[in-house]
């Protein structure tokens, strides 16, 4: 997908060489006609990424919460990386990609994604939300390590899932928490070229050992599929269904009809450790699955005051957030200027380099504000996060 998308701009020899065979978007062959007088642009003169920016930012001006949500969505990546994901998931159609991004931002606002991230496990403990915490305490969903493609592995032991003991709201909040947390294990994409050359995604390993129909949760599968397709596009690298018993065949016949072909193509079935070793090193595969990883996940409980930086105001917090937002505004202004340039404009390279520099500053600044906008997780207590 990424290698088929190009942009046409007047580049230096070095930049052309760097972009060769990668991404710098080609012009889309299919773009909708301008709908208003204000859309007096030549669609043959602008690359899809530029068109996406042109279409999206007026919506940010109308709905300030969308801009805020986009900033928080970017996390430790350049904002360009987010735009690239949505464009790639829409086959380079800037109109569709822009609308998909806006829908995602509205979903994040409606779902309260940032509220879930800011409250985290300590809030669940303080409010006696045992449903949320038990899903972590049991080790049902854990970060296992990295696969042979350097993707983080989200390991799900399906036999530990008891849908009858969970409300849909609790399960959906946990799904969002896992999605947002796993993103922090991806390698940061700090420039447009990073987004082109090294798309980052996750390996999801479903361990179906000891699976029974009591563990099946069709509502969860539908919700997860919709999240991957609409709200976290291009996030799934491979989905491994390991040791599926014969009773899973009937289940699979039902759920495969809900999954889009793009996602279905990333699903593989394995039965043995040898099968898994095509994707995961033997040393990472748990001994319970025939591998050499003897480590047993031990959940560490949240501790009092660990999220004080999120809750309390301070001069340091105000200054750090101001810098973070300033870097985003700088990237934003350069990107809006770049999006106005015809692809043949001589200023393309200069302005694009300014975009990348600002995007890199924004991405690098994230870890200075992380403690102010995200509750600590078990992976912070294990000292796994921030060391990707």
From Swiss-Prot:
GO terms for molecular function: phosphatidylinositol transfer activity. Keywords: Mitochondrion, Transit peptide. SMART domains: SEC14 (SM00516). One of its GO terms (biological process) is phospholipid transport. Pfam families: CRAL_TRIO (PF00650). CDD domains: SEC14. PANTHER family: CRAL-TRIO DOMAIN-CONTAINING PROTEIN C589.09, MITOCHONDRIAL (PTHR46590:SF5), PHOSPHATIDYLINOSITOL TRANSFER PROTEIN CSR1-RELATED (PTHR46590). This is CRAL-TRIO domain-containing protein C589.09, mitochondrial. It comes from Schizosaccharomyces pombe (strain 972 / ATCC 24843) (Fission yeast).
